[in-house]
């Protein structure tokens, strides 16, 4: 849950996170601006294998700064393998990041360009660690897929998620969300960039192998507006909309961004 000590604007916004979470100023923070001319094609990168079982979809939860769609992760029915990963990583949840307007919602940038939103699919190293909580702070603990989202055509594959938001309008609300394969939200091409980074909000652990797809997906402006209709407050409290939840890009600090293509 979002603790009240951090947020996305004012005195608990991203530029102040370092006071309570010193790793915010670490050398391997995310997101980054991917400068395509400085990425290196790595022929040793394997193709990605994404295998999600719709039966593992479990619930949707308003966490106060976004919504999470959570998956049953007690077995290997929904896993990410290959690419830059040497082990099998289990799907835990997916969520989106968005901005106040349609032109600035992504966390990762490409050659300085912002996108409308960004989808993150969160996986943990189930080959080495017993649980997500154990993996989350380990250097090889997490693997996140990032999908950049552009406003354009409506995305029919997102509709089931949007329809479920009504049931979780307020912080801490949860509702069943079953029979969904999130691979329908991925772009047709799985060409990707990969680099070592961090969670993009507190606790900001530098434990993430990032896999960012080159190809974008589209959503309509109306669909994106439904994300902003979610409330950051618990029921009965003063209404505060989740208007934005994206961290600005962080310094690369000499890290290499590999390309699969």
Swiss-Prot record:
Organism, as annotated: Bos taurus
Modes of activity regulation: Inhibited by acetazolamide.
Reaction equation(s) it catalyzes: hydrogencarbonate + H(+) = CO2 + H2O; urea = cyanamide + H2O
Gene Ontology MF annotations: carbonate dehydratase activity; cyanamide hydratase activity; zinc ion binding
Recorded name of the encoding gene: CA1
Broad class of where this protein is predominantly found: cytoplasm
InterPro entries assigned: CA_dom, CA_dom_sf, Carbonic_anhydrase_a-class, Carbonic_anhydrase_a-class_CS
Binding-site list for Zn(2+): 95, 97, 120
Protein name: Carbonic anhydrase 1
PROSITE patterns the UniProt entry points to: ALPHA_CA_1 (PS00162), ALPHA_CA_2 (PS51144)
Residues at the active site: 65
Enzyme Commission code: 4.2.1.1, 4.2.1.69
Annotated positions of the N-acetylalanine modification: 2
Binding site for substrate: 200-201
Physiological role: Catalyzes the reversible hydration of carbon dioxide. Can hydrate cyanamide to urea.
Record Pfam families: Carb_anhydrase (PF00194)
Domain Alpha-carbonic anhydrase residue range list: 4-261
Family: Belongs to the alpha-carbonic anhydrase family.
Primary enzyme class: lyase
């Amino acid at each position: 849950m979002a603790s009240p000590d951090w947020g996305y604007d004012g005195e608990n916004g991203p530029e102040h996170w370092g006071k309570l979470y010193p790793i915010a100023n670490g050398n391997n923070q995310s997101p980054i601006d991917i400068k395509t001319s400085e990425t290196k094609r790595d022929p040793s990168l394997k193709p990605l294998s994404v295998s999600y079982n719709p039966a593992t979809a479990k619930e949707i939860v308003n966490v106060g700064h976004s919504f999470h769609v959570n998956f049953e992760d007690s077995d290997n029915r929904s896993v990410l393998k290959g690419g830059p990963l040497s082990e099998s990583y289990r799907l835990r949840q997916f969520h989106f990041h968005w901005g106040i307007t349609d032109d600035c919602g992504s966390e990762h940038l490409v050659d300085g360009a912002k996108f409308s939103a960004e989808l993150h699919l969160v996986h943990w190293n189930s080959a080495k660690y017993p649980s997500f909580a154990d993996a989350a702070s380990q250097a090889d603990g997490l693997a996140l897929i990032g999908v950049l989202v552009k406003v354009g055509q409506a995305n029919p594959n997102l509709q089931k998620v949007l329809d479920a938001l009504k049931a979780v309008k307020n912080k801490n609300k949860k509702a069943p969300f079953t029979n969904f394969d999130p691979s329908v939200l991925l772009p047709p091409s799985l060409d990707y960039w990969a680099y070592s980074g961090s969670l993009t909000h507190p606790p900001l652990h530098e434990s993430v192998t990032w896999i960012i797809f080159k190809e974008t997906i589209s959503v309509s402006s109306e669909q994106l507006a439904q994300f902003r209709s979610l409330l950051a407050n618990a029921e009965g409290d003063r209404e505060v909309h989740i208007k934005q939840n994206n961290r600005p890009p962080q310094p690369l600090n000499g890290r290499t961004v590999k390309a699969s293509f």
